[in-house]
Amino acid sequence: MISRVVLTTYVYPTEDEEKVRKAVGNLFDLEMFEEREEEMGDLRRLEFVCEGPQARLSLGRIYELLREQEILDAARRVLREGVTAEGSILFHLNKQAAFAGSVSFAEGGESPLGPIVVEVFPERPEDVEKVIDWLAPETIDGKPIYEVKKPRLREEELE
């Protein structure tokens, strides 16, 4: 269903890089991601890429938090608005909320310290609706009408 997940954020001069990593790590299992860094003057660009079978698993924490925080309807709207012409799903998360362990969408990419940019690539562009239905299904009174099977959260559970 999902072939790749790419997370991108910037570390500003006023920020502690470890806190930025912690913010991202509160929402995503960074052990599943390959990390890339790039110096850009005073900024440092951090990119985390997860490809293959673990890509879906890497969204497990977000999957759980959307349900715990009861924000499936808002998430579904943001995900649908974030569908790109190439068939990926692009959305922004508030870095400060992530540091506190919460999902908060930074609409339009607006976040005081810059957002965590998330891009989810379905295996096929036509699978984009399946990905949205899995991550943020339609609801009635805030409860999912149906649930697509939740992924196992750890690689060892695949055995």
Swiss-Prot record:
Gene3D superfamilies: 3.30.1440.10. It comes from the Archaea. Pfam families: RNA_binding (PF01877). InterPro entries: PAB1135-like, Ribosomal_uL5_dom_sf. Belongs to the UPF0201 family. PANTHER family: UPF0201 PROTEIN TK1335. This is UPF0201 protein MK0399.
